[in-house]
């Protein structure tokens, strides 16, 4: 019974995160509309609230294309795995009710975010294009350098909170 409740809580958390990201992009589009002195996405429904759902429908109905010489399976699995990792990181965040109790939640966060490097590398490699491979390797180097500084800042905060 506890497993079913944690599964329902996890699914509810994932749905809430995805919907909140959709509405944050709506907020971003509205702010950009005001900054650029043009009409933002206020025309659909009441204050543009149905706009994220229309965008989701548009994204799911787009035609799926892939490069001719690419590795088909890894080309499509790597972005899905990246999305899965970014949603999996939310499981260790302490909310009103903890879904999963981790003693080493910070280490789990660093491990999950560092796995995202492999998805970028596999996505660049699987397209069988030299330019995509070089772009993927540049993104890997940049991500690793940012993760080192993130880990050092996190350990510094942890160290000063214990003193």
Swiss-Prot record:
Membrane-spanning parts: 3-23, 77-97, 104-124, 143-163
Catalytic reaction(s) noted: a ubiquinone + NADH + 5 H(+)(in) = a ubiquinol + NAD(+) + 4 H(+)(out)
Protein origin, superkingdom: Eukaryota
Any GO MF annotation of the entry: NADH dehydrogenase (ubiquinone) activity
GO cellular component term of the entry, any: mitochondrial inner membrane
GO biological process: aerobic respiration
Short name of any one Pfam family annotated for the protein: NADHdh
Record's subcellular location: Mitochondrion inner membrane
Entry EC no(s): 7.1.1.2
Top-level EC class: translocase
Membrane topology (UniProt): Multi-pass membrane protein
Keywords, ordered alphabetically: Electron transport, Membrane, Mitochondrion, Mitochondrion inner membrane, NAD, Respiratory chain, Translocase, Transmembrane, Transmembrane helix, Transport, Ubiquinone
UniProt record similarity statement: Belongs to the complex I subunit 1 family.
Function: Core subunit of the mitochondrial membrane respiratory chain NADH dehydrogenase (Complex I) that is believed to belong to the minimal assembly required for catalysis. Complex I functions in the transfer of electrons from NADH to the respiratory chain. The immediate electron acceptor for the enzyme is believed to be ubiquinone.
PANTHER family: NADH DEHYDROGENASE SUBUNIT 1 (PTHR11432), NADH-UBIQUINONE OXIDOREDUCTASE CHAIN 1 (PTHR11432:SF3)
Name of the protein this chain belongs to: NADH-ubiquinone oxidoreductase chain 1
Gene name in the database record: mt:ND1
């Amino acid at each position: 019974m506890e497993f079913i409740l944690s599964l329902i809580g996890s699914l509810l958390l994932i749905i809430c995160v995805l919907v909140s990201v959709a509405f944050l992009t709506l907020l971003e589009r509205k702010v950009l509309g005001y900054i650029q002195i043009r009409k933002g996405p206020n025309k659909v429904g009441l204050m543009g609230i149905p706009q994220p759902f229309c965008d989701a429908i548009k994204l799911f109905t787009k035609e799926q294309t892939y490069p001719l010489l690419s590795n088909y399976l890894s080309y499509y699995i790597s972005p899905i795995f990246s999305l899965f990792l970014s949603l999996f990181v939310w499981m260790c965040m302490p909310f009103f009710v903890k879904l999963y109790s981790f003693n080493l939640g910070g280490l789990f966060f660093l491990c999950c975010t560092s796995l995202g490097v492999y998805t970028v590398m596999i996505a660049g490699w699987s397209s069988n294009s030299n330019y995509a491979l070089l772009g993927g390797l540049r993104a890997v180097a940049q991500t690793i350098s940012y993760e080192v500084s993130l880990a050092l800042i996190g350990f510094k905060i942890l160290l000063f909170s214990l003193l």
